[in-house]
């Protein structure tokens, strides 16, 4: 019974290391986290003046924090 337990543990260890190797190792999740952390929230963009808040005059959707420029004014979310 003890040998069977050890055998199962070794098999589980081998399967988990194989899964790490096939998925690109430990670097891939770190890259995703780094990519996602570069994005700013809407509040941060507004606070730093990178986009316009609700009810401001606008000429295109991209300059509004909400992404909606309706009748020349930024729309609320």
Swiss-Prot record:
Its main location: secreted. Residues 20-49 form a propeptide. The keyword Disulfide bond applies. The presence of a 'disulfide through disulfide knot' structurally defines this protein as a knottin. The cysteine framework is VI/VII (C-C-CC-C-C). It is found in: Secreted. InterPro entries: Conotoxin. Belongs to the conotoxin O2 superfamily. Keywords: Disulfide bond, Knottin, Secreted, Signal, Toxin. Expressed by the venom duct. The keyword Lyase does not apply. This is Conotoxin Lt7.1. It holds the Pfam family Conotoxin. Residues 1-19 form the signal peptide. Disulfide bonds join 51-65, 58-69, 64-74.
